[in-house]
Amino acid sequence: MGVTAVLMLPLLLLGISGLLFIYQEVSRLWSKSVVQNKVVVITDAISGLGKECARVFHTGGARLVLCGKNWERLQSLYDALISVADPSKTFTPKLVLLDLSDISCVQDVAKEVLDCYGCVDILINNASVKVKGPAHKISLELDKKIMDANYFGPIILTKALLPDMISRRTGQIVLVNNIQGKLGIPFRTAYAASKHAALGFFDCLRAEVEEYDVVVSTVSPTFIRSYHVDPGQGNWEASIWKFFFRKLTYGTHPVDVAEEVMRTVRRKKQEVFLANPIPKAAVYIRTLFPELFFAVVACGVKEKLSVPEEG
């Protein structure tokens, strides 16, 4: 019996591997069928995540409208997509200059976006501006700039494109948000405020447009890290709070987030929290045991401030 079990084990592993491969292939083909011929707008397409979303949706056969505030980088992304694409299975992306922090021009850009294909099926609100520092040292002008880029800009664009979705009774709006839309992390007051505001808006919008068959989705990773950068080491890393804060701030790779955005579109998920167990636990602790959460965070800040910076 033992010999039989040993002989069966490789076959079992092979069978499981085969099933996983089939599942992945079916999921990949399903993803393509879901977005094929769909008009997909991606804001801040020149960011790390924006590029990966562009790659995933372009490969899936979507009609892309790529938005960004730097024309040269948009053109570079365009060239990269075209160079590896099968022209018989993909569409040539449209490029649109858009700086969401300049809210005075968003309405006009929304019209330009609609003019590309006449409609929008999927809007991926990806643009984001970050700032870090003590609250009393961040100017009101910078606070406003962060709110314009992370809140007012995306909602102006969404409101401009939404009537078309409602009239056609179809569409999906995806907000790429952040864990800081659910809890605040010290020294990121302006950023956290903008992310809380954005999440609140799209949570409300979800209920409002459900009757029109318009789906509103939010994808909230911890942080979206750059391709080759790992969390930095410093003196503070030796403190007893390093585990909590490093796990809370250690980001997700852009490729992983882009694939999750595609799954969110494919499955029409309403909310996705893309994080390892430590940040997830922090959100639950913040909700169920707020005083404990505040105490831990405050102690961590005191510990950080008591350790001199390197260099």
UniProtKB/Swiss-Prot annotation:
The organism's place on the tree of life at top rank: Eukaryota
Presence of the UniProt keyword Signal in the record: yes
Pfam families: adh_short (PF00106)
GO cellular component, one term: longitudinal sarcoplasmic reticulum
Database matches in InterPro entries: NAD(P)-bd_dom_sf (IPR036291), Sc_DH/Rdtase_CS (IPR020904), SDR_fam (IPR002347), SDR_family_member_7C (IPR052148)
Active site: Y191 (proton acceptor)
Keywords linked to the UniProt accession: Membrane, NAD, NADP, Oxidoreductase, Sarcoplasmic reticulum, Signal
Reactions catalysed according to its record: all-trans-retinol + NAD(+) = all-trans-retinal + NADH + H(+)
PROSITE patterns: ADH_SHORT
The EC number(s) this enzyme carries: 1.1.1.105
Localization (cell): Sarcoplasmic reticulum membrane
Alphabetized Gene3D superfamilies for the sequence: NAD(P)-binding Rossmann-like Domain
Class of this enzyme: oxidoreductase
Signal peptide span: 1-18
Example of a GO biological process term: regulation of release of sequestered calcium ion into cytosol by sarcoplasmic reticulum
An annotated Gene Ontology molecular function: oxidoreductase activity, acting on the CH-OH group of donors, NAD or NADP as acceptor
Similarity remark: Belongs to the short-chain dehydrogenases/reductases (SDR) family.
Domain notes: The N-terminus region encompasses a short hydrophobic sequence bound to the sarcoplasmic reticulum membrane, whereas the C-terminus catalytic domain faces the myoplasm.
Function: NADH-dependent oxidoreductase which catalyzes the oxidation of all-trans-retinol to all-trans-retinal. Plays a role in the regulation of cardiac and skeletal muscle metabolic functions. Maintains Ca(2+) intracellular homeostasis by repressing Ca(2+) release from the sarcoplasmic reticulum (SR) in myotubes, possibly through local alternations in NAD/NADH or retinol/retinal. Also plays a role in Ca(2+) homeostasis by controlling Ca(2+) overload in the cytosol and the SR in myotubes.
This protein's name: Dehydrogenase/reductase SDR family member 7C
Biological classification of the source: Eukaryota, Metazoa, Chordata, Craniata, Vertebrata
